[in-house]
Amino acid sequence: MDDRFDTVLAANNRYTRSSYFEWTAALRRVIALPLLSVAFFSAVGQSLQPGHLPSRKQVAPMAPAEEKNLAFVLDWWRKVIDARHTELAANYAAEDFIQHNPNIPTGRAALVTFFKSLGPAIEPIPDRLANPPILEGARGNFVWLVFEHKFKNPKDAAQSVYEYSFDLFRIQDGKIQEHWDAARKDPGSPAFIPSTAPPPSTWNTVKPSAAEQQNLAIATRFEKNVVEYGHIEDIEELLSSSFIEHNPVEPVDREGLKHFIHSLPDHQSQDIKPEWKNAPALEFTNGPFVVMMWEKSYKDPSDPTREYTRDHFAILRIEGGRIQEIWD
């Protein structure tokens, strides 16, 4: 556990975009593989906030073609990821599949090699996912999934902790062409090769409705004005009185979150500028949901002279002109 982890636990750097993923990514090394280190979780146990409950299953509204894309990704996950039937990978992933997880080389062949190394295929292929997503949606050629992972709080065995992992896919020509998640690079994993793919925003071609544009403006105001520039006075206007925060190291409700942000030592109110301090690499709407993804560079744990890129996510559900829930 490095010094940056200690800093995150002390000041929860979600608000500088190094985020809660600084410790939850240690629980989830790679796609579909939530891992728990008891010693590590014990170290962060004192930072867990009480009152968090499991999320209810929610599905974003989709057009028929988008529903087809979602079903395609879930079928791939069940057969290739969960059951490790890598002989089926070519049915789902493009040969030049682009991988943004820093622990897995890019390309379909590398994906097959990686999942073969995890063990034999499961026979027969299960009818259902081992851990179905609690949030799922598709917008244009993007498919997004949020998974919930339940653990026991080492400081209180009666209390459960709910941690979330995020996966984003881009579909092209009927195949999975690109994948992003929030994994942190592990020491000893293959050398990270930066992607030369076009920025993810390039593929965001669906025009949002007027209501979705309003939702995006609300999400932007929260993430930019409140999170980046520290204007907590906007919270009561932006967040519902019944707001739920699903990040387990943050207070679960609106008032708690307001006081939490105010207490951060580096989060005094600043003059709001037109530009973001760290603009999202991708943002899109999906009915009441706003999906945002940021990219950030980190030192490679295997080679401090090199850097790698990690992705950070926030999913905001907005109804009635207020943010109702956030997963991050």
Identify the meaning behind each predicted range.
Residues 7, 23, 42-43, 99:
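Generic detector of N-terminal low-structure segments
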Residues 11, 35-36, 177, 324:
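Enrichment for repetitive, rod-forming helical segments
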Residues 46-328:
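C-terminal and inter-domain tail/linker signature
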Residues 30-42:
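Bacterial N-terminal signal peptides
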Residues 1-27:
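N-terminal secretory signal peptides that target proteins for export/translocation
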Residues 1, 14-17, 36-37, 162, ...:
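N-terminal leader/targeting signatures
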